Structures are given as C-alpha cells and as structure tokens.
UniProtKB/Swiss-Prot annotation:
It comes from Homo sapiens (Human). Glycans are attached at N4, N9. The lineage of its organism: Eukaryota, Metazoa, Chordata, Craniata, Vertebrata. It comes from the Eukaryota. The gene is LPAR5. Residues 332-341, 357-372 have a biased composition (Polar residues). Receptor for lysophosphatidic acid (LPA), a mediator of diverse cellular activities. Residues 312-372 are annotated as: Disordered. This is Lysophosphatidic acid receptor 5.
Length: 372
C-alpha cells in the first residue's frame, strides 16, 4: 500500500494485502466504465430527448438508466483507489461512492421489478389494474423509489468511512473494505439484512412471480400470439437473467459473509477469508448490471431501437419522418378515445411503440414529465 504522507501509529494494524483483488477490480471496472458510461448516457438521451412518446415501461427504463449512469460516473474514483491501493481522497468521497453502489444495486432491483409488475398488470389483469398503469402513477412510484434508496444511502454512507492501517512506516486509509468485527456485530449486519430484504428479496420474489404468471398466461391455447407479446417474453426473460447473474450471487454471498463476520455462524478465519474472496468477485457481477441494462432497452423496446437506427439517417429524412409520425400520433389519439373500451388486450402492448393508438391515449408523457 502506498501513501502520500501520514504519521506512523503503532496502535494501527498492518494493512492486509488486497493488491490482487485491487488489480482484478481495476481491470473489470475499467471495462464497465468504458462500456457503461456511453451506453447509459445514450440511453438516457434517447428516453429524455429523442422519444416523444413515453409508455409506462419507458418511465421505469429511464430511471433505471439514470441509476446506472450515476454508478458509472462514480467509477473513476474507485479506479484511482484500486490503482493506488490506498484512499487519497476526502473521507466524504469514500462514503458517497460506497453509498452510490448500494443505491444503484437496490434501485436497479426495484426498477426491474416495476417493469415486470407493469407487464404482469398489462397481460394478466389488463382491466382490473388498468388504473395503476398510468404515467403519473409510474412517476410517483419512481419518485418513491428514489426517496427510499436515498434514505438507505445515509446509513450506508456512515458505515463506509475509510479504515486506517499501517503500511511500512506510514498510516494509510482503505475504502470499501476492512470493516471491523465490531462494526459487523453492531449496526452493519442489521443494515445489510434490511437492505437485502427490501431491495433484493422482495423485488426478486415479485419478478419471479410476475414472470411466471405472464408466461403461464401467454402459454394458454386461447392466448393471442403477437410480435408484441414475444417482445414482452424477451423483456421478462432478460430481467430474470440480470437478477440471476448480477444480483443473486452477490446478495447471497454478502448475507453469508455478514453472518460469518458478525460471529452468528462459527467459521475459521481461512474459511471466512475464502468467502470474502468469492464476495469480491460477486461484487463485480453486481456492478456489471449497468452494462447489461442498455441491452435490454435495445432488444425489448422497439421505439428505443428505432430511434438509435434513425440516428444514422440524414437529418432531413429524420425530420420528415418525425413530422409524419407526430401527425399520425395526433390522429391516433383522437381515434383511440372511441376504441379504447373495446380493446382490453391492448393494455399489454406498452413497450415504447409510438404507432400503438391505445398506448398513446393511456401512456403518453412528455420528456419533461420524467420521474427523475
């Protein structure tokens, strides 16, 4: 561990050798930053500026992209720490960066859950839950999610204070690691378990249940098969893959590690260190979700995909097409008023497609109406 300058303190313990882990994190997070920053910045631009029609699903996707972008913007600070092997910045920046990771992970879980629940309401209960599938309701839910994760960010920031250790003749600071046993026995384990219950287990249960019900409904012989519904299946499968690949391994390992560190489950020091080594790999999978989410937008949201394809067309053709689309949208909104009551199945088709007349009458919102 290298440091700029600090006085030697004999009461400070020697620094653990985290350099192999730091090198791994340096490589993986560099790739996540290189891919995640442009992808999420582009996704947020498409949702807020390019798309003129927002479905309920797009509101959730827009907020998910904002959460991912916030995390990728914090990665340069992490990379500096992993390159230097010590924390050279103010303590507050360590606390903020650690809290942002928690906000992104649990916020992503909840936003993915809201996308799945919206598809469940649209396909399984298109009429009974119709009143919940409005842009205003979606915006309020997203505001509630941001408020919730900000509330949890306060205690998360408090426990992420840098720890001090001794490297050769210098006292240095570590961030994101080396939490003391006293901290684990105190407020850290209850905080971790509460965050996992509300931010991971509840969304996971909702995603599994809603996906299962939607798949069961669409598999019935009398179910209407359409391209839109196939896209819904792809969207739900993608959300399940992200949960199983990114969030389940990390949160499961974190719970086990917390029980070991708090001494609620007896284990030897080598066994505990092995679990920590696994956790350091799983945390990289959790951070990689911000790269996978934009792929979900592209392959499941037709309006998003068409907008990206349109970026390569000449400006005049793009403007002409946009004007024609807006004229068609205005006509569709007028006709949808008379046909809305006779199309219950259309409630399942809100996946960012501007040409759907039902989605126009029920789920249209301006970019200024984003829940950010």
């Amino acid at each position: 561990m290298l440091a700029n300058s600090s006085s030697t303190n004999s009461s400070v313990l020697p620094c653990p050798d985290y350099r192999p882990t730091h090198r791994l994190h340096l490589v993986v997070y560099s790739l996540v930053l290189a891919a995640g920053l442009p992808l999420n910045a582009l996704a947020l631009w498409v949702f807020l500026r390019a798309l003129r029609v927002h479905s309920v699903v797009s509101v959730y996707m827009c907020n998910l992209a904002a959460s991912d972008l916030l995390f990728t913007l914090s990665l340069p600070v992490r990379l500096s720490y992993y390159a230097l092997h010590h924390w050279p910045f103010p303590d507050l920046l360590c606390q903020t960066t650690g809290a942002i990771f928690q906000m992104n992970m649990y916020g992503s879980c909840i936003f993915l859950m809201l996308i799945n629940v919206d598809r469940y309401a649209a396909i399984v209960h298109p009429l009974r839950l119709r009143h919940l599938r409005r842009p205003r309701v979606a915006r309020l839910l997203c505001l509630g999610v941001w408020a919730l994760i900000l509330v949890f960010a306060v205690p998360a920031a408090r426990v992420h204070r840098p720890s001090r250790c001794r490297y050769r003749d210098l006292e240095v600071r570590l961030c994101f690691e080396s939490f003391s046993d006293e901290l684990w026995k105190g407020r850290l384990l209850p905080l971790v378990l509460l965050a996992e219950a509300l931010g991971f287990l509840l969304p996971l249960a909702a995603v599994v249940y809603s996906s299962g019900r939607v798949f069961w409904t669409l598999a019935r012989p009398d179910a209407t098969q359409s391209q839109r519904r196939r896209k819904t299946v792809r969207l739900l499968l993608a959300n399940l893959v992200i949960f199983l690949l990114c969030f389940v391994p990390y949160n499961s390992t974190l719970a086990v590690y917390g029980l070991l560190r708090s001494k609620l489950v007896a284990a030897s020091v080598p066994a505990r260190d092995r679990v920590r080594g696994v956790l350091m790999v799983m945390v990289l999978l959790a951070g990689a979700n911000c790269v996978l989410d934009p792929l979900v937008y592209y392959f499941s949201a037709e309006g998003f995909r068409n907008t990206l394809r349109g970026l390569g067309t000449p400006h005049r053709a793009r403007t002409s097409a946009t004007n024609g689309t807006r004229a068609a949208l205005a006509q569709s909104e007028r006709s949808a008023v008379t046909t809305d009551a006779t199309r219950p199945d259309a409630a399942s088709q809100g996946l960012l497609r501007p040409s759907d007349s039902h989605s126009l009458s029920s789920f249209t919102q301006c970019p200024q109406d984003s829940a950010l």
